[in-house]
Every structure is written in structure tokens, then in C-alpha cells.
Amino acid sequence: MIRILLSNDDGISAPGIQTLASALRGFAQVQIVAPDRNRSGASNALTLDSALRITTLSNGDIAVQQGTPTDCVYLGVNALMRPRPDIVVSGINAGPNLGDDVIYSGTVAAAMEGRHLGYPALAVSLNGHQHYDTAAAVTCRLLRALQRKPLRTGKILNINVPDLPLAEIKGIRVTRCGSRHPAEQVFCQQDPRGQDLYWIGPPGEKYDAGPDTDFAAVEQGYVSITPLQVDLTAYMAQEVVESWLANTEVDGEW
């Protein structure tokens, strides 16, 4: 039986992770290690300045107190799930993680930590808040396929599912990340003592939503699968930077 470490960024009681756990337990051994509260937008944050405490629930699920998604996967792999998992799954997120969203997403970060620690990893998001059962069914189907034939890319699979009944899903597309215009809006308020409060505004509008992007696939009713990698090196820019250094003589005599 496949062993799955399951985490998220919406918190341990979120409907997405609970729906997915129920579906996965039909054919897998599942250990939930998730934040005790919503940590959306936590990205790859790792808690280094304080100790982490856990609460083990009556069903065996583990909540990490004030933990980030990355904390949860790190603890799950290195301390809390024994034997260790075969795969790390993050989700189901309430709302999509498309395009530039992946740099902020705690859902994607949890999967990235799993991959960084040497495990296959999936991040699963629903383009809405209704049909979690659809996203769970898609995830189960992919995991069963991975059991039959492992995918040895060494990459994270970022999966975005349209918020539709399963029968209305048109299929699966392998995509690239689209992009958004930068978000510039900040909401300023004052508390009762006159101190300024700032709220981060909504994400920017779509900028690159071409036919091969994750945006386009989900909008057209397809499940989007975008391979992501931990290595952020821009290999094609290395020669450009080398040439620039030579031409500007920055790397000259010190």
C-alpha cells in the first residue's frame, strides 16, 4: 500500500485536505501533517527562530502549531511519519495556484519541500470552493497511475482542477506557467487608536494566458499539470551575465 504524507496551506480542518484524505484512504496509507491554521501565501517559509509543537488529533492527523506548510512536510518526513512516505501530496487548495501564484503558494511550497527532500510530490488546487470531490478524484487517478508506472522526472507536478463536476472535465493538459500583471493595490485603514493598517490587495490580472498556459487550460475546462522544479537557475542567462561582466569590467582587479 502506498504511503502518502498529506499537507496543505489552508489548515488541517480545511475541506480540501479532509476530502482528499478520505478519498486517498481508499487505497493508501495517509498521514496528515498540516498547519493548525490557514497559512496561505506562506511560500517556502521555514520556522528557524522558535521550537515547533504538534497536536495529534483522535484520528491520528497531526496539526503543527503555528507551523508553515514547509515546516509540516519537513517534520513529517524527518520525524513524524514512520515508515517514511512514498510520496508527498499537498492540497486540495481552496482556489487556484496558476502562473505567478506559485511563488507565493504554500500549497506549492509544501510539495516543493517534499521534492527537495527526495520524494515525488504533487500540489493540487481547485479553481474555486465547491467541487473538491472532482479534484480528489483527479488526484486519486493520477496517484494510481504513478503506482503503476512511476514518473521519474524529478519535478513537482502542480495540478490545477476546474471547479466543475467530474463529468464535465474535458481532460488533462500539460502546461507552462502563465503570468499576471504586477499587483499594486494596497488597502490602508486605521485601527481605533489611529494606527495605520495595511492589507495586501488582490493579485494582478492575467498578462500571459496563452493557449499552452495553465490559465488557458483551466478556463477551458481541462485539468492543468505544470512540471515545476526546485532548481531556479536560469541556465540560458548564464552566458549573458558572463558577457556583461566581461564588458563592464566589474570582475577586474580588486
UniProtKB/Swiss-Prot annotation:
Listed SUPFAM superfamilies: SurE-like (SSF64167)
Entry EC no(s): 3.1.3.5, 3.1.3.6, 3.6.1.11
UniProt: a divalent metal cation binding residues: D9, D10, S40, N93
GO MF annotation: an example: exopolyphosphatase activity
Recorded superkingdom: Bacteria
GO cellular component, one term: cytoplasm
Cofactor: a divalent metal cation
Cofactor note: Binds 1 divalent metal cation per subunit.
Record InterPro entries: SurE, SurE-like_Pase/nucleotidase, SurE-like_sf
Key words of the record: Cytoplasm, Hydrolase, Metal-binding, Nucleotide-binding
Subcellular location: Cytoplasm
Catalysed conversion reaction: a ribonucleoside 5'-phosphate + H2O = a ribonucleoside + phosphate; a ribonucleoside 3'-phosphate + H2O = a ribonucleoside + phosphate; [phosphate](n) + H2O = [phosphate](n-1) + phosphate + H(+)
PANTHER family xrefs: 5'-NUCLEOTIDASE SURE, 5'_3'-NUCLEOTIDASE SURE
Family of the protein in this entry: Belongs to the SurE nucleotidase family.
Purpose of the protein: Nucleotidase with a broad substrate specificity as it can dephosphorylate various ribo- and deoxyribonucleoside 5'-monophosphates and ribonucleoside 3'-monophosphates with highest affinity to 3'-AMP. Also hydrolyzes polyphosphate (exopolyphosphatase activity) with the preference for short-chain-length substrates (P20-25). Might be involved in the regulation of dNTP and NTP pools, and in the turnover of 3'-mononucleotides produced by numerous intracellular RNases (T1, T2, and F) during the degradation of various RNAs.
Name listed for the protein in its UniProt record: 5'/3'-nucleotidase SurE
